[in-house]
């Protein structure tokens, strides 16, 4: 049975095997033909044959290379915006023919307000180069009779959209007289529109001529001022030097008064004779130093005049020389003040017994000066303090103040602030009061030391 079935099936198997072999052979032939065709074929790029690389069939399928297509935009022709603007003659005069408007336009630079004005006038934007030229050629809106109302309404809307400051700027450029503080925005828009419909000169005064006149006046005044300053400079500097000398002279006079009072008080005492000699020597020294300072200032003034005439040195060097001379004179007078105050303090500290008698005799002298002080106080409307009041306040100030840093001017300021009166004219009297107060304070300290020593001795005895 098995042999019979095999014999029956063999013709069918043979038929199927033959069909499969034919299919494989046809496939191989087709692939070989394709490979040969691809090798022979070439892609033409720019007139040249380019053979694509051949890869074996077993690895990957073959792909045809595609040609790159570039996307190019056709540029349209340039718009007509670069064409010159056609300006037709309006109802009024051209803005460049109105002198004030032309003058203001010449002073202005292209800015946002001018660009906005150009768009309102012509409905188009303009380049910065042609901006002022186009505005100057404007002579009024050109509207047809049929569309006049519509065009006027459009122009009014454009002006209403602008800020008040811009409308004021338009009025300034177009020389429209306006009260900036009280005018309203609506009124500004109406005035600008009326002017632009028919531009005309608003006033007869020419701004260019008025500004030229003002410039001429300024130049003439500046020349006069410079000439006046050049002629009066030495006189001014002399005045300044004199002013600097005045306070030093007053200080010297105060010191001389102190010296004279000291001499009058010491007539009845034999011990005070050397004080008089010292005070006289101090006065002579101060006078000599004043004379030297005056001679220095005079010499500096002569040098300045000679330098001005010859024009050898600049003004800066002159000012330096003035400042140097003034500073030197101030330093010299300050040194004199310090030396006099220190010497007077030492002399009066050594002579404690005579200080009490001086206090009695000096009370009579301020009464003579009191008449002058009362005259000044009557003019000012305030009563000046007496010597006793000054003495009390000075002692309080001296207890609070450091002797190393405090000066006479500081004490005078504190006294003035306390009494509400300027006491610079009583400088010499205040100086005497200060010395008396210092002596009293030193006496009190000595008495305290003696009391403490006595108490210590008593305790030691006990």
From Swiss-Prot:
Chromatin-associated protein which contributes to the modulation of chromatin structure (such as super-helical structure of DNA) and function. Binds to chromatin of protein-coding genes throughout the genome to regulate nucleosome occupancy and chromatin accessibility, and to modulate the expression of target genes. Found in a mRNA splicing-dependent exon junction complex (EJC). Binds specifically histones H3 and H4. It comes from the Eukaryota. One of its GO terms (biological process) is regulation of DNA-templated transcription. It is found in: Nucleus; Nucleus, Nucleolus. A motif (Nuclear localization signal) lies at residues 344-351. Gene3D superfamilies: Homeodomain-like. Residues 33-46, 267-276, 441-462 have a biased composition (Acidic residues). Its main location: nucleus. Residues 384-439 form the DEK-C domain. The keyword DNA-binding applies. Residues 402-416, 431-435 bind DNA. This is DEK domain-containing chromatin-associated protein 1. One of its GO terms (cellular component) is nucleolus. Residues 77-91 have a biased composition (Polar residues). It comes from Arabidopsis thaliana (Mouse-ear cress). Residues 18-91, 212-390, 438-462 are annotated as: Disordered.
